[in-house]
Structure formats: structure tokens, C-alpha cells
Amino acid sequence: MMPVTNVLLLFVLWQGDLNSLLTRAAAGDCSGVSPQLARMWATPGDSQSRRLAGLALAQCRIAAKQFPEAGSVVGELERDFPADADVLYVSAAYHLKAWNDAVYRMYKNAPASYRVDQLSAEVFETQGKYTEAIAEYRKAIAKNSKGIDLHYRLARALLAQSHDASALEQARQEFAAELRLNPADAVAEYQVGQILTTQLKPAEAAAHFERAVQLRPDFAEALIAVAKIRSGAKRYPEAVVLLERAVKAQPNAEAAHYNLMVAYRNAGRAEDAQREKTEIDRIQKPPEGEFTNFLKRLGGPPPPK
């Protein structure tokens, strides 16, 4: 067995090498230090030293646009240090730069692709430029009318721009087009139901809500919609069953708990209704956390309850 003094000496030397490598990597000498960083990253040992080596190695590989190799390191870092701010920062940088590089190559190599129009539409959508987004989605559909998700995204952009009668009908038609391509799209079914409800066509809407629940039995919003229909028909026990499923699917969904509370009351289950009221109060109460505790230490009031 190696004497303890020798082990400590090796550790100190290893740490010195690491500090030197980190300094060189930070100065931009990635080509000169990456092989040694990779060896340190692959060597079992002190976890924090491996973390530092991994962070530097990932950043060097990102800078060199070696995204598959960087992704491997980032993935292991996230697994071993899931709450580490430095790891999460490097992960964000990796995904952003990999995305930007892929987008650049797509615009360069396939400028006429419908995917370019789709991506442009998505960018406009995030900027709140819905007129431009709608135009780009329509270009994409003109090039590939059978592209999955294009009609859905166009419908969503139409609704984001306006809820007037014309926009609602156009959106309904686009959701319907999506369903013709992908009949298993529960969200599109639900959206059609929502529009038909707004258009005062409850019977047609109900069929779409029912279908959405069939497609996705844990779809909380669709379960709530069907439960409201059951409650409207005074079929309260059936509404309760549906809403209990919605609450199970989304335990912190206030709308699910509220509708379940009302259904319990209508079904004569006062104690269960009170339990749901307590749960709603819990959801609405701001969580106690670091910021609240910080305010308390300063003598300031916590957020209003």
C-alpha cells in the first residue's frame, strides 16, 4: 500500500496540475489542455476536482463546436451534480450554442425547406409577432400540407392573435386539419371542443371533450370539461369520478380542486367538499421559502396571503 504521505503528495500535485489546466483553459488554450482535462474527468477521485475538470472540458468542447462530445460531458455533470449552478449554466450554454449551430446549418443547407418557415414562425411567435408567425406557418403548410403539428401551431397562433369569430373558425378548421393527419392528438380534440363551446355548440363540443379523454385518460383539462357537462346534467357521481382523476393527474391544479369541491357539494358530500376547500387554500397560499425568510429577517412583511 502506498504511504499516506505519498498519496497526499500526489493529490497536491494533481490539484496543482488541475489549477494550471483551468487557468490555461480560461485563457483560451483549449487545444493544449483538453486531452489532460479529459483524462482527469475520466479518472475517479475527488468529486469537486472532477467537477471542475468536467466543466472546463465541456466549455472547451462547446467552444470547438464539438457538440456530441460536449453533450456527453454535460450529461454526466447534470447526473452527478443536478442542482449545481455552474453545471446548469454550462448546460444552458451547451444547449443554446448547439441549437444556434443547428439553426445556422439548416438555413445554410436547406433554405427552401418548410422547416425554415416553421422555425421562423416559432421565433415570431415567441416575440409576439403573430401576423408574421401566421404567414410563416402558412408558407410551411403550402410546402408540406401533411406536416405533423403545423396546422396545430397555426391554429394556436391564430388564437393568440385574436378571439373574434373569424379567428375562432379559422383556428377550428386548422385543429380539424391536424386531427385528420393525427387522430390521436388529444390536445387538438380539446381545443376544438373549447372553440365549439365558445361558438355555442355544446353538443358538438362534448363529443370532442369525450374523445380527448379517451385518447388521454389523465388529461386534466379535458376531464374537467367532461365533468362540467356531467354536472350540468345533474350526474354528480360521474362528475366526481372524473374530477378525482383530474386531481390525481394534476394535484396542484386549482381548477380541478374547485370543480371537485362543487361536485362534492352537489352530490351531498359536505366533508369531502370541505377537504377540497382546505386543499384549495393550501394551493393559493404562497410557499414559505428563502425570499420570505429573507424578508422576515429584514423585518419586512411576507407576501400577502
Descriptions of predicted regions:
Residues L9-L52, K285-L298, P302-K305:
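N-terminal leader/linker segments that initiate helical-solenoid repeat arrays
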Residues G16-P35, A56, C60-A63, V116-G128, ...:
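Alpha-helical segment of the N-proximal tetratricopeptide repeat
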Residues T43-D46, D80, N109, K143, ...:
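Structural marker of alpha-solenoid helical repeat scaffolds
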Residues R51, A85-D86, Y114-R115, I148-D149, ...:
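Helix-start (N-cap) detector for alpha-helical repeat units in TPR-like alpha-solenoids
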Residues A63-S72, H95-R105, Q127-K139, S162-A177, ...:
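Structural signature of tandem alpha-helical TPR/SEL1-like repeats
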Residues R105, Y258, V262-K305:
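Terminal, low-structured helical/coil segments at or just beyond the last alpha-helical repeat
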